[in-house]
Swiss-Prot record:
GO terms for cellular component: plasma membrane. It comes from Haemophilus influenzae (strain PittGG). It comes from the Bacteria. It is found in: Cell inner membrane. This is UPF0283 membrane protein CGSHiGG_02710. InterPro entries: DUF697, UPF0283. The keyword Electron transport does not apply. The chain crosses the membrane at residues 57-77, 87-107, 211-231. Pfam families: DUF697. Keywords: Cell inner membrane, Cell membrane, Membrane, Transmembrane, Transmembrane helix. Belongs to the UPF0283 family. It is a multi-pass membrane protein. Its main location: membrane.
Length: 354
């Protein structure tokens, strides 16, 4: 047997490297936003006050008109008194009183807007403090930002009508530590001080959303639903603002009116679609009942969405991660409320037919 010699050959495969790619003046295509994100962005854009030269000119013109009206009323009173025209004098006095009452309401409205602006500034300050604390070294907490966060939280407590010796504030102060960052201080403040206000707002949102859903589900008239949703949404905004110590005026309500109109349009459009669809498909009671339940839940969720947005705007301390209320906790309650009311009504209706 002959000896076989095997030669060890090393096969070196050539590696092919992809050359580098260079991009010059390339356009980046952004991902499309979700529907919910678009609604939030549109709402926030609608709520932001738009300052322009026309608005400044309009304010200046209104001020001149008010001063001229007051001066004309005073001149009218003086001329009527000099000429002994008592009827004209009475009209002039009434006009002056009405003008003064209007000026008083304008001043009160301006004060409400100032309070709302201060609340927005508190939110912006809290966000700025958290941003500065996050940008700095994560291991070494900034003492300056921590002190600013404490002062901001105390200012927020005063805006809510809470003194430094209130039980919630004292409990929050006992939980503080020198090693805590600005975000941790604000989180403790939210948990010990703002939690009671947040609980009231969440309970109110759930209650009014469920009521709106039930009424829309059992009401056969679209016009009634539209006016009912408008009234309930305005009342919801007022109550949430009252919980957080804000008195909404005319112009501050206008800033949230677009979301209310969305709810009104949804209630009216879905009810009209329901009527047309049921007439076209069939007169089946079960199908109509299912459509009404879905419609009521949809309106209830939109009402809850409005309440959460109003809560986010009226809350003095901006929400941190995982603090903002979600609509998931309202869905089950809405479903159970609408099913109990509507299905109970359907059983009574069937018994009457029998």
């Amino acid at each position: 047997m002959e000896k076989q010699i095997f030669e060890h050959s090393v096969n070196v495969e050539e590696e092919h490297y992809q050359p580098k790619q260079e991009f010059h003046n390339m356009e980046a295509k952004l991902d499309e936003a979700l529907d919910g994100e678009l609604l939030d962005a549109q709402l926030e854009q609608a709520l932001k006050p738009k300052s322009s030269f026309r608005k400044t000119l309009l304010k200046f013109t209104a001020l001149l008109f008010g001063l001229a009206t007051v001066a004309q009323s005073v001149q009218w009173i003086w001329d009527s008194y000099q000429q002994h025209q008592w009827i004209y004098l009475a009209f002039a006095l009434v006009s002056l009183i009405i003008i003064l009452l209007g000026i008083k309401e304008i001043i009160c409205e301006w004060r409400r807007l100032v309070r709302l602006k201060k609340r927005e500034q508190l939110q912006q300050q809290s966000q700025q403090i958290w941003l500065e604390s996050a940008v700095k070294n994560g291991d070494v907490f900034s003492v300056h930002n921590a002190e600013k966060s404490k002062i901001l939280c105390l200012d927020i407590a005063k805006s809510l009508g809470l003194e430094n010796d209130s039980p919630a504030v004292i409990q929050w102060q006992h939980q503080l530590n020198e090693a805590y960052s600005a975000q941790e201080i604000a989180h403790l403040f939210s948990r010990h001080v703002l939690s009671s206000f947040d609980a009231q707002a969440k309970k109110l949102i759930s209650k009014m959303a469920a009521e709106s859903a039930v009424i829309v589900a059992i009401s056969p008239l679209a016009v009634v639903d539209m006016f009912f949703i408008a009234w309930r949404n305005l009342r919801l905004m007022n109550k949430i603002a009252e919980i957080y110590g804000i008195e909404l005026g005319y112009f501050s309500r206008i800033r949230l009116l677009r979301m209310v109109l969305v709810n009104i349009a949804f209630a009216g459009a879905t009810e009209v679609a329901q009527d047309i669809g049921m007439d076209w498909l069939s007169q089946d009671v079960t199908a109509k009942l299912s459509t009404r339940i879905a419609q009521g839940i949809g309106v209830g969720l939109l009402t809850a969405r409005l309440g959460v947005k109003a809560m986010e705007l009226c809350r003095p301390l901006a929400f941190q991660l995982n603090e903002k209320p979600k609509l998931s906790y309202i869905q089950q309650e809405l479903l159970s409320s609408v099913k109990d009311i509507v299905l109970g009504k359907n059983k009574i209706y069937k018994k009457e037919q029998i």
